């Protein structure tokens, strides 16, 4: 008799799989939940490749909104291509335009937006395509920044890991330079755009050797 078990239970909503080796870490107070408790209406926006990142992962392991009345999830279907090096712009433009609409609408107090380009195209190892991918995100961010300014808001730009920032690596065996298709271990940017900053808050100081991660953003 054979018993099949996964490394962990990856579908908490449906309790699947039934047999697993390690329990899933629980996140009892994800940031989205805090927003719901404050009654802040929010939108999540990305394309297919990163939809779980703005829903399942961001919610601490649950796919569905905690309160559908004030949480809107928006998905733009990704291009169906053999490799994203063939379409490095992906859906950055569409995501940017949709985000502008949501920001200008005045209906939301918070928005979570994920651009997939730098990661998905970075995985292809195609340097030229990666440059186009990053440029596409830059072009989408520009109008979003103006929209945020128009509604007296502020924006935080960051990432959970690098990829397109390091497209070449040295082969440990041959010593030759070759394409890198893996995540990098470099520190990621953390940018705050607040055109009306009045000194009412400041960024927390962390020790230089502290292991920082996304949980420190909020």
Give names to the regions the model predicted.
Residues 1-218:
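Feature captures the catalytic ectodomains and active-site-proximal regions of enzymes
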């Amino acid at each position: 008799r054979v018993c099949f078990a996964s490394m962990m239970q990856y579908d908490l909503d449906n309790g699947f799989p039934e047999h697993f080796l390690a329990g899933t870490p629980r996140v009892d107070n994800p940031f989205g939940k805090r927003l719901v408790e404050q009654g802040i209406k929010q939108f999540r926006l990305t394309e297919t490749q990163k939809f779980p990142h703005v829903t399942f992962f961001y919610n601490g392991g649950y796919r569905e909104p905690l309160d559908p009345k004030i949480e809107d999830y928006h998905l733009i279907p990704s291009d169906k291509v053999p490799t994203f090096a063939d379409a490095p712009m992906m859906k950055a433009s569409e995501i940017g335009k949709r985000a502008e609409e949501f920001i200008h609408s005045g209906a939301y107090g918070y928005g979570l937006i994920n651009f997939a380009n730098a990661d998905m195209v970075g995985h292809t190892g195609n340097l030229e395509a990666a440059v186009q991918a990053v440029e596409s995100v830059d072009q989408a961010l520009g109008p979003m920044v103006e929209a945020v300014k128009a509604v007296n808001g502020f924006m935080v730009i960051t990432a959970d890991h690098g990829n397109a920032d390091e497209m070449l690596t040295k082969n440990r065996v041959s010593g030759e330079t070759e394409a890198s298709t893996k995540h990098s271990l470099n520190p990621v940017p953390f940018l705050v755009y607040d055109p009306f900053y009045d000194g009412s808050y400041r960024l927390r100081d962390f020790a230089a050797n502290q292991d920082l991660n996304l949980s420190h953003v909020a």
